[in-house]
Regions:
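His/Asp/Glu-enriched, well-ordered alpha-helical/loop segment
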Residues: 1-75
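C-terminal cap of metal-dependent C-N hydrolases
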Residues: 49, 69-106
Length: 106
């Protein structure tokens, strides 16, 4: 309903030991789709662009575009629509942070 009313919804882990020990954004995206009724597209916008805007970082992160910091996840999926169905599995193949591929420690 909030999205239909034009509100910008943000998804985040808000990791806080003791009250919220979830660190997995794929899990948060899955929960938003399965229990809150967001489409996968709405969940991705909420987890990326809207999150960047909420932190006043929309000129740096939150989109894949020229001039943006390249923070990317590479997934083992045929479509982003599969994410809610893999919520308990790590389907991430690789991570890029600021344009550099990270060593596979995830």
């Amino acid at each position: 309903k909030m999205i239909d009313m034009g509100c910008d919804v943000v998804l985040a882990t808000d990791f806080n030991p003791g009250s919220c020990t979830i660190q997995s954004m794929p899990l948060i995206i899955s929960l938003a789709c399965l229990y809150c009724g967001l489409t996968i597209e709405e969940a991705f916008i909420a987890a990326t662009w809207n999150g960047a805007r909420a932190l006043n970082q929309e000129n740096i992160v939150g989109a894949v575009s020229t001039g943006y910091q390249a923070d990317l996840l590479f997934w083992d999926l045929n479509s982003i629509n599969e994410i809610p169905y893999w919520m308990s599995s790590n389907r991430i193949l690789n991570v890029m942070k600021k344009g550099e591929l990270l060593e596979k420690e995830f």
